[in-house]
């Protein structure tokens, strides 16, 4: 769920998930359209696509099992929708961590996202 995703982001990046990623670029936050503005926004685009492939549960509300081991995020559910959304969140949190050096506050609340959305 979104709370768990936020905990993963905070663990991997050390930033507030709401203030740093809740309204960033074209895809971080609610909705999404246009072309991702940078690598961080691309992480959100891929995450949105991953959520779109979830079948059988609500990615934003369903609670899955995970933990942190040696700095890594480990999903606990072995299969199914809960495993899928945990992996979506895990991969996105890692992606944010890998791209933290290109994160740019100028893309907070971006108004440039008016084009047609990319395909997943």
Swiss-Prot record:
Compartmental location: Secreted
EC number: 3.1.1.4
Keyword DNA damage: no
Record-annotated active site: 47, 89
Residues annotated to bind Ca(2+): 27, 29, 31, 48
Cofactor(s) required, per the database record: Ca(2+)
Chain segments annotated as coiled-coil in the UniProt record: none
Enzyme type, top EC level: hydrolase
Keyword terms, alphabetized: Blood coagulation cascade inhibiting toxin, Calcium, Cytolysis, Disulfide bond, Hemolysis, Hemostasis impairing toxin, Hydrolase, Metal-binding, Platelet aggregation inhibiting toxin, Secreted, Toxin
Top-level taxonomic group: Eukaryota
GO cellular component annotations of the record: extracellular region
Pfam family, one: Phospholip_A2_1
InterPro entries from the UniProt entry: PLipase_A2 (IPR001211), PLipase_A2_Asp_AS (IPR033112), PLipase_A2_dom (IPR016090), PLipase_A2_dom_sf (IPR036444), PLipase_A2_His_AS (IPR033113)
Name by which UniProt lists this protein: Basic phospholipase A2 Cc2-PLA2
Organism, as annotated: Cerastes cerastes (Horned desert viper)
